[in-house]
Amino acid sequence: MHCLPVLVILLLLIASTPSVDARPNPKDDVPLASFHGAVNAKRYLRTLWNSRDCCDPKEPCCFIG
């Protein structure tokens, strides 16, 4: 019975600790939406580059990445 108050206090302390989501974001964190924009831009540039008449499509000079 001596351990019961200690156990209750520990459970209350564990329940009151802040979760991982409660911590503030640093200024250098970049939201994932900005990365999606970069992917779309790269896809658009690749489409433009491949659609121009630079050489035979089988040649590597017509493809990016």
Curated annotation (Swiss-Prot):
Q: Which residues carry this modification: Isoleucine amide?
A: I64
Q: Name one Pfam family in it.
A: Chi-conotoxin
Q: Which organism is it from?
A: Conus tessulatus (Tessellate cone)
- Positions of the propeptide removed during maturation: 23-52
Quote the protein name from its UniProt record. Answer: Conotoxin TsMRCL-05
Q: Which family does it belong to?
A: Belongs to the conotoxin T superfamily.
Q: What is known about the tissue distribution of this protein?
A: Expressed by the venom duct.
Task: Write out the entry's keywords from A to Z.
Answer: Amidation, Disulfide bond, Neurotoxin, Secreted, Signal, Toxin
Give the signal peptide range.
1-22
Reported modifications of this chain? Contains 2 disulfide bonds that can be either 'C1-C3, C2-C4' or 'C1-C4, C2-C3', since these disulfide connectivities have been observed for conotoxins with cysteine framework V (for examples, see AC P0DQQ7 and AC P81755).
The cellular location(s) given in this protein's UniProt record come to: Secreted
